[in-house]
A protein has these predicted regions:
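Residue-level marker for buried hydrophobic side chains located in beta-strands
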Residues: 47-49, 190, 269-270
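Divalent metal-binding pocket/active-site signature
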Residues: 124, 129-228
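Divalent metal-dependent hydrolysis catalytic cores, especially in the metallo-beta-lactamase
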Residues: 54-60, 72-104, 117-130, 159-171, ...
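Active-site-adjacent C-terminal substructures of enzyme catalytic domains
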Residues: 200-291
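Surface-exposed amphipathic alpha-helices with a cationic face
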Residues: 106-109, 179-186, 259
Length: 291
C-alpha cells in the first residue's frame, strides 16, 4: 500500500486562519498553521453530515424500483459533492411500505462496507404528519395516519441500534405515547409538518421530543400575525432546530431572525435534498409532484 503523503493549504472554514493539512490515504496526519497563500486557495472544512436526504444524483430513495446499484450511485454523488455521511430519509407512504423499504435497504447497508460507512442512520419523515394544506408540504396527504407504540416497536425491531430520527405531528392521536416509546427505544423524535398548539408542543417535549424538522418550511404561505407555528416553536422549549438555508424554504430575513433567537448549538442545517439535487437538468419527482 502506498504511503505517499500529500498536503493542502487553505483557510480554516471557521476562523479564516491559514492552515496546512497533511494527509495520507485519506487520513489526516497533521494540521498546522501556514503562511498566507493565494487568494484562490480553498476554504478547508470537515465533510458534511446531512440529516435529511430523500434522494440524490437522479436517484429517488422513495421508489420501489430502488436498487443497491442505484443507491451506490447516489452515495458516490453525495461523496463527490462533500457529503460522505447522511441519514437516508423516507417520506410519507403507508406504514407497512415504510417498514418494507427500510428493511430492504438495511440489508444492503449492513452487507456493503461503503453503504454502511455513508448511511449514518435513518430519518423517517411520515406518515404521522398533518393532513392540513400547507403543513403537509410535498407529502401525500392521503396516506397520513396516526402513530401508536406498536408501529414504533415494529420500526425499532428493524433498525435495532441504528441512529434514527423520527419526525411526526404531535397533534395526531397516539403521538404522545409513540414519542415516549420511540425515545425509550433510543430514537430521536423531532416535531414537524404540524400545526400543533403551544400546549401540544409542550406535551411533546415532555414526552421526549427534542427537535423540530426544517422550521419555516411545511407551513402555509400566509400565517396569522398573532398566533402561528413559528411563534409557538420559538416560544416553547429548547428544540434542536433544523433549517433549510437556501433562501427559498426560509427567507433571508427569517434566517437571520432565527439565528438571533435560537442558540447556535441548537441549530442544524439540512438540504432536504431530493433526486434532482446533484443531477443533470431534467424532470424528477418529489412525492407525487414532478419538478
Amino acid at each position: 500500500m502506498s504511503t505517499h503523503t500529500q498536503s493542502i493549504t487553505g483557510r480554516h472554514w471557521k476562523t479564516g486562519d491559514w492552515i496546512s493539512i497533511e494527509f495520507n490515504q485519506k487520513k489526516i496526519l497533521s494540521i498546522s498553521s501556514a503562511a498566507h497563500g493565494s487568494m484562490n486557495a480553498p476554504w478547508l472544512a470537515p465533510s458534511l453530515l446531512d440529516l435529511q436526504v430523500n434522494g440524490y444524483g437522479g436517484v429517488d430513495f422513495q421508489k420501489k424500483s430502488l436498487s443497491e446499484a442505484s443507491l451506490m450511485k447516489a452515495v458516490e454523488a453525495l461523496n463527490r459533492d462533500g457529503c460522505p455521511r447522511f441519514f437516508l430519509t423516507l417520506t410519507s407512504s403507508g406504514w407497512p411500505s415504510i417498514l418494507s423499504k427500510i428493511k430492504r435497504i438495511k440489508v444492503w447497508r449492513d452487507n456493503n462496507p461503503t453503504l454502511r460507512k455513508c448511511i449514518a442512520g435513518w430519518h423517517v419523515e411520515g406518515p404521522f404528519l398533518s393532513k392540513e394544506p400547507g403543513y403537509c408540504g410535498a407529502h401525500d396527504s392521503s396516506v397520513m395516519e396516526d402513530p401508536n407504540p406498536e408501529k414504533i416497536q415494529a420500526l425499532g425491531e428493524i433498525i435495532q441500534t441504528d441512529p434514527t430520527l423520527l419526525t411526526l405531528a404531535p397533534e395526531r392521536p397516539g403521538s404522545m405515547e409513540s414519542i415516549l416509546h420511540a425515545s425509550q427505544l433510543g430514537m430521536r423524535v423531532s416535531v414537524g409538518h404540524t400545526n400543533a398548539d403551544t400546549a401540544c408542543l409542550s406535551a411533546a417535549e415532555s414526552a421526549g421530543a427534542t427537535g423540530f424538522t426544517h422550521l419555516g418550511n411545511a407551513c402555509p404561505q400566509k400565517l396569522d400575525r398573532h398566533d402561528n407555528l413559528i411563534f409557538r416553536v420559538l416560544d416553547c422549549g429548547s428544540w434542536m432546530t433544523g433549517i433549510i438555508p437556501d433562501g427559498v424554504h426560509v427567507s433571508p430575513a427569517l434566517f437571520r431572525i432565527l439565528h438571533k433567537l435560537i442558540p447556535l448549538n441548537q441549530i442544524y442545517y439540512t438540504t432536504d435534498a431530493m433526486s434532482a439535487a446533484g443531477a443533470t437538468p431534467g424532470r424528477y419527482t418529489i412525492g407525487n409532484i414532478e419538478v
